[in-house]
């Protein structure tokens, strides 16, 4: 997200985390610091194989609460990053591209290195491609690290999300299918989706 008003509107919906893309190749890349950054929602910085010093500097400049890594960052990289950012970053998320149960094996070396995994759709482009993978693949996930479900979840998927259960599911990622244009969220679509999910839980 990049626009101050849109950030305020989305935060007002009670969203837990708000993401800011710091990968220059992304159409959602944050070119400059927004005039407003979330005060109640956690600030998530998304990086792809970035120089570790760049991540550290960005995390400090934006007062990030969470770092989300979408590249081929190693467990050693994550350990080093955590030591550099321990004063302000509380959580590190590592994303993995998933298509088959075999893909889940790549998470094993990261157990204990990261706080959450994020399971995204395997595609040529990194993130935000609007397509889903077969969530039943995650029935084979037996890891101890909680995960965030990502990959093409849209406004029409509320019932599907409510029907999905896994003991390690920690949350869902709402991205490109809730946008009017890259980096700008449709607040009405988000509100309706969130209300549908919450009503089911009451």
Q: What are the functions of these language-model segments?
A:
Residues 1-202:
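Conserved N-terminal beta1-alpha1 strand-loop-helix module at the mouth
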């Amino acid at each position: 997200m990049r626009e101050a008003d849109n950030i305020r509107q989305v935060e007002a919906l009670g969203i837990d985390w708000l993401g800011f893309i710091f990968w220059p190749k992304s159409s959602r890349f944050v070119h400059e610091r927004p005039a407003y950054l979330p005060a109640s929602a956690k600030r998530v910085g998304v990086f792809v194989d970035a120089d570790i010093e760049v991540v550290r500097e960005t995390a400090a400049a934006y007062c990030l609460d969470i770092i989300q890594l979408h590249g081929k960052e190693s467990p050693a990289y994550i350990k080093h990053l955590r030591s550099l950012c321990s004063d302000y970053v509380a959580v590190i998320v590592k994303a993995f591209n998933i298509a088959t149960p075999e893909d889940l094996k790549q998470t094993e070396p990261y157990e204990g290195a990261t706080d959450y995994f994020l399971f995204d759709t395997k595609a040529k482009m990194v993130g935000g491609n609007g397509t889903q993978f077969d969530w039943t693949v995650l029935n084979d996930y037996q890891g101890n690290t909680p995960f965030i479900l990502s990959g093409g979840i849209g406004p029409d998927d509320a019932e599907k999300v409510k029907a999905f259960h896994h003991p390690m599911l920690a949350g869902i990622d709402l991205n490109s299918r809730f946008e009017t244009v890259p980096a700008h969220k449709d607040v009405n679509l988000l509100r309706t989706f969130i209300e549908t999910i919450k009503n089911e839980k009451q």
